[in-house]
Amino acid sequence: MSYNFIKSNKENDFYPVNQSEIEEVEKNLNLKLPSELVNFYLEVGYGFIKGSEFNTNRILDPYSVRDFRLRINDFEFYPDIEIYDEFENDKLIFFEGSESALMSIELNDNNKNPIYYYDIQIATSLTEFLRKIEENDQYYLDLLDDE
């Protein structure tokens, strides 16, 4: 999978991730990270997608994904973190749209991993999600209105 559409935007800001970091986090969590997320980490890394003024649009690094899941370090006292308890059973928080908008990626063995905002599917794959975020980094809010 090529993420050139993300890499080619010079306003995006990414940092490399190596295989050993991914393996360490998988061991710490006792689970396999979704294949699309692993591929993205290895091809692009983690970091920020340029968007609107008030959104962070941060793809969490593997250690932050782990820390959120375990509620440790920076996430130990994260505001209202307990809200996500019920939405994480088969998903993993990986993206921070804003402080109050966190997205999760489905844990499955498929080549495509659906993306969720709370329990609402907002994209069928990581690639679709990233393309939509680049176009409109608040598109998922409109989907909430439809529910």
UniProtKB/Swiss-Prot annotation:
Name the Gene3D superfamilies on file.
SMI1/KNR4-like
Give one Pfam family, short name only: SUKH_6
Grouped into one coarse class, the protein's main location is: cytoplasm
SUPFAM superfamilies reported for this sequence: SMI1/KNR4-like
Q: Which UniProt keywords apply?
A: Cytoplasm
What InterPro entries does the entry give?
Answer: Knr4/Smi1-like_dom, Knr4/Smi1-like_sf
Q: What induces it?
A: Expressed on rich and minimal solid media likely in early stationary phase; dependent on DegSU. Not expressed in liquid LB, but only under conditions that promote biofilm formation.
Q: What top-level branch of life does the organism fall under?
A: Bacteria
What the record says about disrupting the gene is:
Deletion of the yxiB-yxiC-yxiD-yxxD-yxxE operon has no visible growth phenotype, however it is out-competed by wild-type cells.
A GO CC annotation recorded here is:
cytoplasm
The reply on keyword Cytoplasm is yes
Record localization:
Cytoplasm
Keyword Cytoplasm set for record: yes
What is the documented function of this protein?
Immunity component of one of 6 LXG toxin-immunity modules in this strain. They promote kin selection, mediate competition in biofilms, and drive spatial segregation of different strains, indicating that LXG toxins may help avoid warfare between strains in biofilms. Mediates intercellular competition during biofilm formation; disruption of the operon disadvantages the bacteria, but overexpression of the cognate immunity protein restores growth in competition with wild-type. In situ neutralizes the toxic effect of cognate toxin YxiD.
Q: How does it assemble?
A: Probably interacts with cognate toxin YxiD but not with other non-cognate toxins. The interaction inhibits the toxic activity of YxiD.
Protein name per Swiss-Prot or TrEMBL: Immunity protein YxxD
Organism of provenance: Bacillus subtilis (strain 168)
Gene for this protein? yxxD
